[in-house]
Amino acid sequence: RRVHGDRRQRRNLPMNYVILGLSGLVAVILVSNVVDRSNKPVLPRVITPFPSSKLLNLPLFKDDHEESLYWGTYRPHAYLGIRARTPKSLLAGLMWSGIKDGTVSLRHHCQDSDGLSKYGWVSHNGRDFGRQVLIDKDLSLITSFMKYKSQGSGYGGDWAVRIEGKDDKDEGNESMSKFQHLFFYLAEEDSNASLQIDGLDLSESSLLASGSRENVGSWQMHLHSEESLNVHYVGFRTRHFHNLTDLVQQHLAIQVRRRHIFEVSNTVHKMSNVLVFQISGRLPFTVDLSFISGVTMSEVSERVNSLSGSSLSSRLLDKEKEFDAKFEKCFGLKNKVDSDSVLVGKASISNMLGGIGYFFGQSKVSTSKPKGDDDIIDYWPAELYTAVPSRAFFPRGFLWDEGFHQLLIWRWDVHIALDAIGHWLDLMNVDGWIPREQILGSEALSKVPEEFVVQYPTNANPPTLFLVIQDILNGIQKNKFSPAEIHKIDNFLDSAYIRLRHWFQWFNTTQTGEFVQNYSLAAVFYIFRLLYQLHMLNV
């Protein structure tokens, strides 16, 4: 009996150690909670960031890389929308007059109800150049965007927009050609920045507006055109920027009722944060708008001239040639398919790159598992640099879609791809969950029905970012990158590994089903093998 009793005691020893260990762990958790409460409130886990250095703080995303991507066509929901990659930005955009349901309506945000037969980028390099074609019934618009960093430019450099308009039914009779109204606007999100009109007189100067921003410095916006155009302006003060179309349209309606003319009022609110310039004339006409940063008066004229007129034409042509050459280098289609197919390919990569947006805000997330009994709280303030699935219907970030987007984008510019992936992985919370739909900021929120706004921490999207990372690793093996690029990719993956592993663990523990199918096991083994490859890189 004593022998058997000793055996039982020895058998119970491991369990005793387990109980002792669990008791100690509970004690540590209780103590840590007390300590946390004494210092600061404990956040709900769903809105607690993953405890690791942000990928966006890596050196490869700083300095020249960060500045080179500062300005861009990062408002993909607009037919032409420009902003900077900063939470509070100077916004720029285009509206024009069109017909909708038999009445005059402003085109601004991409939407099928406008009835455009065509709109989209035909060339875009994702960095400093893009050309877009828009066909609105008889009106044909070509918009071009380009950046240029000159000596003396402020942070992010200077940029220019060219708008070319023509009447597709015009047969050369100028007196019968269509009279068209464009509305180019500037809107300042930062209350600490300035935005103003200084006595608009285009007969004496090309200056439209001026202002200052902390990192850009003093800036000016100039207009140049060889045609005779009428320019009018209005300045508003508003708290919201997602409804600028309504703001301008309501103002025009008042003007029509009071003065019987379709023309803004040439008045400016003393504290305006939105300036709208109505540019009107008979088609065809071309308008160049130049943003000059880091202004010093001695050099403004020279810099404006370099970004307008024949100089801008030359620069845009050079950028178009560079785009064509890079497209052939990346995809090599010239001798494989016909010329029409090449144009389709160029439009595909251009719309993918031109559909990249920058967003900042807070997601709405639920702390409760079942839908319908929501305790809704805000995620932490976050920025997101991402491609969007649709400029008209889904102009925001979708986790599932982004993996497929970046499968194409990395072949064009791996630095842009890593930047976007880093933004997404930095949205991970302490549990390894990433909200699958990112609705950040008022402009993004305005395009989403209320019932789809809240994100649930039990919901997942397929982890398609793993496909991109596997593809990039294959690209390294196939010598697709330079030694400098490989070094940056290695540094990125080395830092991203801990987040990717945690993300996989979250999937593997929260998304299990009742039945284990062969394809489910195959998916798990695929990701496990990829994580093993990344682990070996880290070793």
Locate the predicted segments by residue:
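Aromatic-rich carbohydrate-recognition surfaces in CAZymes
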Residues: A392-N538
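Low-complexity, Ser/Thr/Pro/Gly-enriched N-terminal "stalk/linker" regions
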Residues: V304-F394, H423, E514
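A generic structural signal for ordered alpha-helices
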Residues: T267, C330, G372, I376, ...
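Intrinsically disordered, low-complexity coil segments
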Residues: Q151-Y155, D168-M176, V365-I377, K447-V448, ...
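Terminal accessory carbohydrate-recognition/targeting modules of carbohydrate-active enzymes
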Residues: R1-K346, L353
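Intrinsically disordered, low-complexity acidic Ser/Thr-rich regulatory segments
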Residues: Q255-V274, I377-E383, E485-I489, V539
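Intrinsically disordered regions, especially transient/low-confidence alpha-helical propensity segments
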Residues: S68, G93, K118, G156, ...
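Generic low-polarity alpha-helical segments
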Residues: M15, L289, K371-G372, L500, ...
